[in-house]
Amino acid sequence: MSIDIKYLSRIDIDREEFFFKDSRLMCKKFDEEREVLTLLEFDTKFRVNLLKKDKVYKYFLVSDANHKLLIANLVTEQQAKDLSFIEKDIMKIASSATAYGASDIHFIREDRICKIKFRVNGTMIDYREILSSEADALMFVLYNVMATTKETTWNRKLPQDANIILVINEKAYRFRYAHMPLFGEGGKNYHAVVRIIYPSNNFVCTNYQDIGYNEADTDAIARILNTSYGLFIVSGTTGSGKSTSLKKYIELLFFNKYKGKGCFVTVEDPVEYLISGAQQSSIVADNDDKTKNPFADAVRSAMRRDPDVIMIGEIRDKPTVEALSSAVESGHYCLTTIHAGSVVSVLQRLSGLGMKADKIASPGFLAGITSQKLIPELCPSCKVSFVDERYQRAVFSANENGCEACNHSGFKGRLLLLETLVPTVEDLELVASENWVSLYRKYRERRFIKTGKKGLGEGFSIKDKAYYNVLKGKVCHEYFMLHFGQLDHEDENIIYENYLQEV
């Protein structure tokens, strides 16, 4: 087999000047311009037998067509073990991350080294360090070769995103790639983060017992979902589990309320989890026409498909807000997510995105709001007890050395904290006047309402619920102090009284 391959040694690659020409990545060597599409490494056997070169180098720059031809030939000869070393290294990192249960993989490329870190149970842990040139090769192949959807060719100097699907232990994992250039020598540094989206475990939430919340939170969610129409907003920071919660809520509606007979449509960017009973659409932006808003167009299309329930993956801009408002006002039940830190700040964000306060305050428009956060849960096998001197409470901290049960981290899994708001007429009056401070005070007054339900209900903040779980021995006291800070004595007493009533 004769294959014309343009090749360079690793030293040449490191010294090479790469540039863009007509949206193509090019390199220049000895005044000859070449298009660069794929960086691969092959062992000696295949360099001699397949590439037919008298003089061979460790790395090759090959055209896309030649890359496909090479891979096809290797696969047909069942020599998968001889595929790109770089691809193998990527798979090793991804496999290790999933084995740890990591939510994200961080590549922090500095002038000489690149630090690889995993986020496990909300905490960053060191994985390993590699040479910066090795990191560049990893990112180049990950983006250009392994990504399924992406923008042109990898360019460290521009913010870029991509979606990747990798099969690990016979299961398909989705990865969301994003990088941003960092300050450094020669403009070569960057921070790349790969979010891991784990394969569906086929769990379907068909009743409120499956939701996994305490009685107070379950009651609030049931009241929000049982309205005939309106907007249900799930908020939280990045990585707070909003998509997982949306899946549960939609399945609850489909099986519990509609008895499996409704038309549920989703508009997502991209689809993250398979939702039983829903017709899911993944929206792809048109890179050639930045003026188009595919999200808003997809929402309008969804309204014409005879839906009972519409789910919009995320509120991002004014056109999406307007399209979503039209869907709610036309009598549909709609669910969506937004980035916000509390239920009251969600309303402020909607106002900032162009949704008028009088529209939000219209009776029936807003079904409810949740704000959520995932925090690490203490390992029950090795947590350490002590007395909090300020309040004289028995609390726990993470064991610095951990144990085998928690991979010596001191934490095992994550705990969902949920803040809920089911709006009353008084709340809506304050929303209409955009009196956010009074709305917050009104919301906090609900802490004193006795519901008879286990757990902290409406009126309690995420911080309150984190401390409640400190008292229950589920959350590390030091973690709480670091991420939430001190509670005043009045708030602490209210939470402690609720804790005593439950135990």
From Swiss-Prot:
GN (gene name): tcpT
Pfam family, one: T2SSE
Role of this protein: Involved in the translocation of the TcpA pilin.
Subcellular locations according to the entry: Cytoplasm
Coiled coil spans: none
Organism from which the protein derives: Vibrio cholerae serotype O1 (strain ATCC 39315 / El Tor Inaba N16961)
Primary localization class, coarse: cytoplasm
Alphabetized UniProt keyword annotations: ATP-binding, Cytoplasm, Nucleotide-binding, Protein transport, Transport
Name listed for the protein in its UniProt record: Toxin coregulated pilus biosynthesis protein T
